[in-house]
Amino acid sequence: MLNSAYIDLNQLRQNVNNVRKNLSKITRFCAVVKADAYGHGAPKVANAIYSRVDCFAVALLEEGKELRNSGIDKDILILTPLAFSDISTAVFYNFILSVDNFKTLKMIESECAKQNRKARIHLKFNTGMNRLGVNSLKELNQLSQHVQRSQYLILDGMFSHLGNPENKKDTKTAQNKFLLANNLIKGYNNKAICHLSASGGYLQNIGGDMVRIGILLYGYKPFKSNFVNVKPIMKVYAPLIKTRTIKADEHCLYGQKRADKTERVSLVRCGYADGFARQEKSFLFNNRCMDISAVKRANNTNRGVLIMDNADLLAKQYGTISYEVLVNSTKRAEKIYLQ
């Protein structure tokens, strides 16, 4: 028995429309569907919003291939560095490739020569997050020169990422660095796509040639903001296995918690292997097992027992973020799409 994840594609499209309203007509909308669209199913999500966005972004080569094989023929940007063994396939599939070092750049160029193809490159620039990207304008300029001189490489863009978009000082510092990089890249190609904003930057009304929208697609925000209205698109239900009576001073499942009085407990087919934390404070009788939970107040519907309709609430209980809850919540769930 699998859990059931009901995913509302109409609400997904509405979220996209709402985000789009705050963008200028010339700003490109890049839908981030990495990690299986944050647990929502990348092929279905991408095809549902295909006509409403300009391109897609993924983290891994395999994720890009999955989109291509599902019929997505729009641009796909791979956000993270490629393994050297993946370069040949990435060139063949015509993905946009992110690069921040000469070794990778030269290997891509060599593979393009073998295949007699060209590859579009987005150079990664570090504006303060200190994760990926070259650190200086000098390095960025050297990479740009190499791309520009190559008959097999196209300087299609440059990008960075805000590490702390809620902090105005950090964000302003990053913007200033990015502007210098933007001016450098535009000097080589004034049509290059330069992008800094993900969902957090978008909520701060930081534009650019393109915005990369991830968590907002799925109805959540990286921090509180009234800039745009989005709603969650997924609810997860677990099958009810049985209901049993626990007498006073008895316990159920693992843990030392015992019943204060005789009470009814519902056992549902949902455990920490399904991506839900062992210790959830809201309605569990005791700690979750790997595959089963004991629920004190189960409302069994024709879909099963609702175990998640708001990832923010669970994230608060777990001491984590909605992103982590979402990507884990459909590990063992059948995805059911509402058109």
Where are these regions (language model features)?
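Active-site anion/phosphate-binding pocket segments in diverse small-molecule metabolic enzymes
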Residues: L2-D8, R13, L82, F102-K103, ...
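Active-site loop/helix belt of alpha/beta enzymes
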Residues: K21, A35-A48, V91-Y93, L105-E111, ...
